[in-house]
Regions:
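Catalytic Walker B motif of ABC-type/P-loop ATPase nucleotide-binding domains
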Residues: 149-152
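Helix N-cap at the start of a conserved alpha-helix in ABC-type nucleotide-binding domains
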Residues: 160-162
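Q-loop/switch helix immediately C-terminal to the Walker
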Residues: 84-95
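Conserved ABC ATPase signature
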Residues: 124-128, 132
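Helix-to-loop junction immediately C-terminal to a conserved catalytic motif
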Residues: 53
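Conserved ABC ATPase "signature" region
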Residues: 102-120
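The feature captures the beta-strand-to-loop junction immediately N-terminal to the Walker
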Residues: 38-40
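ABC ATPase C-loop
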Residues: 141-142
Length: 203
């Protein structure tokens, strides 16, 4: 979608005042791209996601969001409601956006199919594997209608085939008008991204 933009200018962050996670980070984040955020553990990937989400103010520099309505964050360790059905997890964001129940259910079923969860629609969340729960939370983030999708280690619990499916879905979401930023250690996710931000370049 034209007009959506997240701009980082000379962004840096420190928790101690003397040791910086990263400094002088400049980037223009746009739809139709998947940005892989890479670097060793402790390099600040999750902190930068928090800055992008607006939860943390950078120690220096500025961040601007243009035409960014909703931000959705998919955490590394998915959190769902144990006894709630899979389809309800995805229907609820659609209902919150004003769809009626039949519309919300139809959209939810389509989305679950895209993430390989169609046969799990009536299962309870607690019955899912780690990989299934991760895909469900991605689907839920999509259902929320987010302009900015932040994803933390989406393939950490997935086998190679499922990870490739998730990486392909992230690419498809970016082409539908989302800005997608993925913190990852997975070289396959990095390779599937259109752009790489390596925090080691900003030490």
């Amino acid at each position: 979608t034209p007009g959506k933009l997240v701009t980082l200018r000379d962004v840096g962050h420190t928790f101690t005042g003397d040791t910086w996670l990263f400094r002088l980070l400049n980037a223009d984040l746009r739809p139709d791209r998947v940005y892989a955020l890479v670097g060793p553990s402790g390099s600040g990937k999750s902190t930068l996601l928090s800055i992008l989400a607006g939860w943390v103010k950078p120690s220096e520099g500025s961040i601007q969001r243009l035409n960014i309505g909703k931000t959705s964050w998919v955490f590394q360790n998915p959190i769902g409601v144990a006894r709630r059905s899979v389809i309800d997890h995805v229907m609820l964001p659609y209902l919150a956006r004003g769809l009626d129940v039949p519309q919300a259910e139809a959209c939810a079923r389509e989305l679950l199919a895209q993430f390989g969860l169609a046969e799990r629609a009536s299962s309870e969340y607690r019955e899912l594997s780690g990989g299934e729960a991760q895909r469900l939370m991605l689907a839920r983030g999509v259902a929320s209608g987010a302009d900015l999708l932040l994803v933390d280690e989406p393939t950490a619990q997935l086998d190679v085939h499922t990870a490739d499916t998730v990486n392909a879905r992230l690419g498809a979401l970016s082409r539908q008008g989302m800005i997608v930023v993925v913190a990852t250690h997975d070289h396959r996710t990095r390779d599937a991204a259109t752009d790489v931000i390596d925090l080691e370049d900003y030490q």
